[in-house]
């Protein structure tokens, strides 16, 4: 596959976040509401689209848990399917809950505390020291932080190969400070102008604007975007539709929530140009 520039997602591509971000989602809801969903259930929300921001994923899971308390009788996968039918993301999750009886809706809304959920999420993920550094205050409780439980996927050899052969950028839903931690850990030096984080754009994936901007900055005719979710592939296909002057390839990796043959089929159905076992297969895939 020919390309001029390679743009990398972080979570599930450069580092494994199964025991960090995803764990923080389910445990945040459990701490605040005393019940949650299995971590495996999160993939259905991710597949629904619109949950590149894990805070919003946490809020949606909390909505589902609260709705269950008020009489919602559908499994997680069915709830996520309804979310997908309504366009994905947090607004769609709220729309599904809005189909409940008005009294039940009101009870859910009264108990749904996004500020508290975010506070707990950040404390669990960052740990006490980084919470004070990044959030500018004391955490709600003391903890070491799941951020330390992110095994590196990208090898030094792969990083050197990609940066020697191509322009390399980063496009992630992480806040900037948290992206810095991951990039430092994998030893990937990417300038500010060649990366987009949660802090740099409002739309989030799968909106193509950030990927298109990186293509412009690289002056690249062909861009390959590597991610671990269907929204990453949709970002590339949306960019190809919005910017026909360039070619955009979406490559899915099987080191995130999508794995095995089922994950491969989902990527292909979403329009992936290729599916790789991991980011470390990219050097052989790209020309």
Where are the regions a protein language model picked out?
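Glycine-rich phosphate-binding loop signature in dinucleotide/nucleotide-binding domains
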Residues: 1, 162-166, 217-221
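Active-site neighborhood of HAD-like aspartate-dependent phosphohydrolases
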Residues: 1-50, 56-59, 63-68
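Substrate-recognition element of Asp-dependent hydrolases with the DxDx(T/V) motif
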Residues: 25, 134-141, 146-184, 198
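A metal-dependent, Asp-based hydrolase signature
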Residues: 49-149
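Short active-site oxyanion
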Residues: 166-170, 222, 271-272
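Substrate-recognition "cap/lid" segment bordering the active-site pocket of phosphatases
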Residues: 171-224, 229-241
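Structural recognition of alpha->loop->beta junctions
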Residues: 188-199, 262-287
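Acidic, Mg2+-coordinating phosphoryl-transfer loop and its flanking beta/alpha structural elements
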Residues: 226-274
